[in-house]
Amino acid sequence: MALTLASAADLLKEHHLLREIIQGDVWTDDPARIASADEPFAGITYDTRKVTPGTLLCCKGQFKAEYLNGIDEAGLAAYVAETEYSAATATPGLIVNDARKAMSLLSAAFYGYPQNELTVIGVTGTKGKTTTSYFTQALINAVSGGKAALFSSVDNCLDGHTYVESDLTTPESMDAFRMMREAADNGMKYLVMEVSSQAYKVDRVYGLTFDVAAFLNISPDHISPIEHPTFEDYLYCKRQIIVNAKSLVLGADSLHADLLREDAEAAGIGVTTFALHDADNAGTSADVVAWPADPAHASFHIADGDQALGDYHLSIDGDFNYLNAAAAIAIAHAVGVSLDDADALHAIESVRIAGRMEQFRDPQSNTLAIVDYAHNYASVTALLDFVYERWGEENPRITLVTGSAGNKAYDRRKEIVEAAENRIANFIFTAEDTDTEPIIDICMEMQGYITNKDVVSTVISDRLTAITNAIYDARAHADRFNILLIIGKGNERWIKDHRKHVPFDGDDHVVERMFGL
């Protein structure tokens, strides 16, 4: 059914969001008093620059009346907002208590509730969301004939095989429902999507129920005035995925796992757990468990209870990725994938993600470069754990090339330093994404957190120069085994600066070019 002003008003009333409808001097609760109430909207947008004849505009966030200049001439049909703009437009306004919640509900309705045509899987956690999501999509694609779509912080995939770079971990609600509609129209039957804490903080997934929610882990992150004021708020927002799910897959070793189980019990949903053990039966009890198959940790056994699921050798290094693999298998099983389908389960082995644990060897020196998205205490610690487990006996000289995001997650700056300073030889602080905060200020702040007098630190604000200098420095110490950890940006081809995406080669391409690969 097409979305009209009348049906939009009814939907908003149902969710106790509609305050009134205003058009000029008409203030009403009855859409029948508006002449155009039964005319279907031709489009929906939250960007005034994209308004065309028949469009419903959602005014959210820091919306300003001046954005409406010339909007009637563009063909605006109606708007949704928390305040009325009768002085700027002659079109009717649906005045609501919460514009973001309203936008999510109306977007779902406009696109014909595409989530009802998909089995929707939500993946949240402080670390591992992207890798787990890719593993899950690969596994489900293997059994469904490529019918799994993906929304991730790296790429979106709406047809099971074509990947396009994404902008947000969880898209704006309107974009999410538009992409769901496209995925469903492309014949997709499943959707795997990363769900950030901000998605619940700002209602990007309001009204969406997940067939399966995966809660991987939790540790402090995203604490800042513009994200979450406290860890409690961060965790509370993350927990909302459980309230809005039909089934939960839970990391058995997650902090506050007991609280998360209580949430699931209160919601009346079942829980499937997963865990990583040091050896068979040497760890927290869980339904799906991974543990090393050999002393070198080159492959891992995975089992579901008493059912052995085989040995796995992933294309992405790191023991923690076998934990992500166990999570993906638990998720797939929760949506009905048979654990007897060995070919499907082993589809995770071939998954590679650009910018995730990518390794490059320098032909000119004994240097290994690892490009990864690690960007907080937990992920930097996990990365260094992997390095020491794999190469610790070779006494590597480790250089960390890092920055930290501007204008948010301020605690990360100190935490990255704390995670690394007693385990590396050198820091090179450099550019990462920022809005208005100067890159050099962020780098200097991070340098100021160093307490280990033996670690060397340098600030090189230009990221290309920072990576280049790290490589030249490693070559100058060719008598040592050098490991360069270049973190935070992965394969992203831009750096955000003053709200603009400035073109950048990508850490992986810079390393490949310097190494002559």
Curated annotation (Swiss-Prot):
A molecular function GO annotation: acid-amino acid ligase activity
Protein name, UniProt field: UDP-N-acetylmuramyl-tripeptide synthetase
InterPro entries reported in the protein's UniProt record: Mur-like_cat_sf, Mur_ligase_C, Mur_ligase_C_dom_sf, Mur_ligase_cen, MurE/MurF_N, UDP-N-AcMur-Glu-dNH2Pim_ligase
Keywords per UniProt: ATP-binding, Cell cycle, Cell division, Cell shape, Cell wall biogenesis/degradation, Cytoplasm, Ligase, Nucleotide-binding, Peptidoglycan synthesis
Keyword Cell wall biogenesis/degradation among record annotations: yes
Record pathway: Cell wall biogenesis; peptidoglycan biosynthesis
Compartment annotation: Cytoplasm
Binding, ATP: 125-131
Similarity comment text for this entry: Belongs to the MurCDEF family. MurE subfamily.
Main localization of the protein described in the UniProt heading: cytoplasm
NCBIfam families hit by this protein: murE, PRK00139.2-3
Organism: Bifidobacterium longum (strain NCC 2705)
N6-carboxylysine modification, residue list: 238
EC numbers, comma separated: 6.3.2.-
GO BP field: cell division; cell wall organization; peptidoglycan biosynthetic process; regulation of cell shape
Summary of the function given for this chain in its UniProt record: Catalyzes the addition of an amino acid to the nucleotide precursor UDP-N-acetylmuramoyl-L-alanyl-D-glutamate (UMAG) in the biosynthesis of bacterial cell-wall peptidoglycan.
GO CC terms: cytoplasm
PTMs per UniProt: Carboxylation is probably crucial for Mg(2+) binding and, consequently, for the gamma-phosphate positioning of ATP.
Residues involved in UDP-N-acetyl-alpha-D-muramoyl-L-alanyl-D-glutamate binding: 48, 169-170, 196, 204
